[in-house]
């Protein structure tokens, strides 16, 4: 059974990408297909009117990035990023007139190269070797020490919020943070028994069983 809501606590373990965040601001205009496209993933199954895709690209797609067929026909946009960081999945919200059920297992989807982010951007940064950290000077008399900048935030979330933890994409619709992998999603994963993608943090209660 897969639930749409994820707890707000640290947890994590996956990209919980989603639709959070404000939608204000300027809307990007459709500039047509790019000059070249790169293979992004293959169709697994349809779920709730969207396509669940297994990524075949070592990079991570932007949210709302346009997705194309090999002939550069636009079919939709990236809606959510799911799964563990070593096996990324994502969903495509189809464009008007496109049916998610019209595709079959293994069909390939493509993306513009500028709509990709390196996975390393979302991994914890290695600690510097011992002895390379400079010592902090003691404050002079009468002066208070300046506050530090705080720990690295990390995160790949479309909306700010409480979600997430360390080491991966945290919450989804409004949740933030980096949580150890892509958390949750739609439908069941192609491998591994009953487990499934949960839709990532956000709207609360589950929708029952897919």
From Swiss-Prot:
GO MF terms, alphabetically ordered: box H/ACA snoRNA binding
Region feature (RGG-box 1): 4-25
Gene Ontology CC annotation, any one: box H/ACA snoRNP complex
Gene that this sequence comes from: GAR1
Annotated InterPro entries: Gar1/Naf1_Cbf5-bd_sf, H/ACA_rnp_Gar1/Naf1, Transl_B-barrel_sf
Role summary: Non-catalytic component of the H/ACA small nucleolar ribonucleoprotein (H/ACA snoRNP), which catalyzes pseudouridylation of rRNA and is required for ribosome biogenesis. This involves the isomerization of uridine such that the ribose is subsequently attached to C5, instead of the normal N1. Pseudouridine ('psi') residues may serve to stabilize the conformation of rRNAs. The H/ACA snoRNP complex also mediates pseudouridylation of other types of RNAs. The H/ACA snoRNP complex mediates pseudouridylation at position 93 in U2 snRNA.
Coiled coil: none
Protein name: H/ACA ribonucleoprotein complex subunit GAR1
Subunit structure: Component of the small nucleolar ribonucleoprotein particles containing H/ACA-type snoRNAs (H/ACA snoRNPs).
Family: Belongs to the GAR1 family.
Region (RGG-box 2): 141-205
Gene3D superfamilies tied to this protein: Probable tRNA pseudouridine synthase domain (2.40.10.230)
